[in-house]
């Protein structure tokens, strides 16, 4: 009788279904998506690696296998956001005057950063908490913007609008000049209308300097 029951039990056994093994890239994307979700909900400083791991039903060790630290996680999120920015920025081409292109780019940067701060306050907190860290995403973002500015300057020189110069070096200088209207920390509590006016004034000043550089 016992033997018969055992056979019946074995007959009704079903193989345990295991979740399909995810690739390293899929796991990495899951971690980034969950981290951003938790940062958005609770704030950057309130979320630990252990919280992200628990939300994904995985061990903290698995998070660290993909990201060496919380800052490394932030760096990866930063690169993802820069990728979105590069797809959305749509700078004006050389058929437009250099001044118009500078103004368009500066306003786009200012408005995008201001909008991000209002829609995603965790971004501001994240920037403050990692300000003193060596973040590769920040360096890359700077490179992207400088390149866009340098292209405008080069086209302006080619058209005879701007004086000949080292466009890449000057692009970096122009970025520094625009910092007060595009850096998230500096514009977080500013009225967008006041920022727009200041941005226009700065762009006009930059344009004048590019047309009439100081004699060395």
Predicted regions and their residues:
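Membrane-interface starts of transmembrane alpha-helices
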Residues: 163, 167-171
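Short hydrophobic/aromatic patch on the recognition helix
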Residues: 56-67
């Amino acid at each position: 009788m016992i033997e018969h029951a055992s056979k019946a039990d074995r007959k009704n056994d079903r193989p345990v279904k295991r979740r399909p093994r995810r690739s390293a890239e899929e796991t990495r994307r899951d971690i980034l998506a969950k981290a951003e979700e938790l940062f958005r909900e609770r704030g950057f400083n309130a979320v630990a690696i252990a919280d992200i791991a628990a939300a994904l039903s995985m061990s903290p060790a698995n998070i660290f296998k993909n990201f060496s630290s919380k800052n490394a996680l932030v760096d990866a999120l930063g690169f993802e956001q820069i990728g979105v920015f590069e797809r959305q920025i749509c700078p004006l081409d050389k058929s437009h005057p250099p001044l118009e292109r500078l103004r368009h780019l500066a306003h786009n940067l200012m408005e995008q950063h201001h909008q991000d701060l209002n829609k995603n306050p965790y971004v501001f907190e994240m920037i403050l908490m990692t300000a003193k860290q060596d973040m590769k995403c920040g360096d890359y973002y700077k490179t992207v913007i400088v390149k866009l500015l340098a292209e405008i300057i080069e086209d302006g020189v080619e058209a005879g609008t701007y004086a000949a110069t080292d466009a890449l070096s000057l692009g970096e200088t122009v970025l520094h000049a625009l910092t007060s209207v595009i850096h998230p920390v500096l514009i977080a509590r500013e009225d967008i209308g006041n920022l727009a006016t200041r941005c226009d004034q700065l762009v006009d000043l930059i344009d004048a300097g590019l047309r009439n550089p100081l004699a060395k």
